[in-house]
Amino acid sequence: PSLTQVGLMEPMATLAAMAMCSKTLRLGTGIAILPQRNPVYFAKEGAAVDLLSNGRFIAGVGLGWSGQEFAAAGTPFEHRGSRMNEYLEVVRSLWADETSSFEGRFYSLPECIQLPKPVQRPHPPFYFGGESEVAMRRIAQYGRGWFGLYLKPEDVAPRLTSLTEELAKRGRSLSEIDLVVSPGNDLPVERMLEAYATQGVS
């Protein structure tokens, strides 16, 4: 289901194609709804894109918001946050560890080896969508970047305050996080860019 009649390309296949016709462009999902995806396949696809692009893949992931979309994909909408946390552990291990196994409430992975590994070590960076307190905690634990969706410049600061606090609890700082915001206003372009830049985002 979509809010518009504009279709969206499947991201991993699209990024693989883009990897073959570019040399320096960073390639990321913005975002892949991880609780809808099999984590083993997502890890395999991500590693392939990272190899094809020689280490330019960004794993942009999020929870999703549409129960209708989850139903269409045949995946449960409930407990998607807890499911995503387990999937993140599985994907991270498959990318970073020589052997992987996992036993959780929503996913079990017998001991296995996934090859080839990504170029980026220990693994491609995770960027996260979402603006809730839980989302900020997830970024602080796993992330290298944050995608803010349709936020006005004045709405960015409270999220960054929350994120800074969560990062500090883990001995991290905001300087370690790439901040990317999709515009949520109709300001002229130059004024808009200046307003977001004052908040530290691109």
For each feature predicted by the language model, list its residue ranges.
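Active-site-adjacent structural elements that line small-molecule/cofactor binding pockets in enzymes
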Residues: 1-202
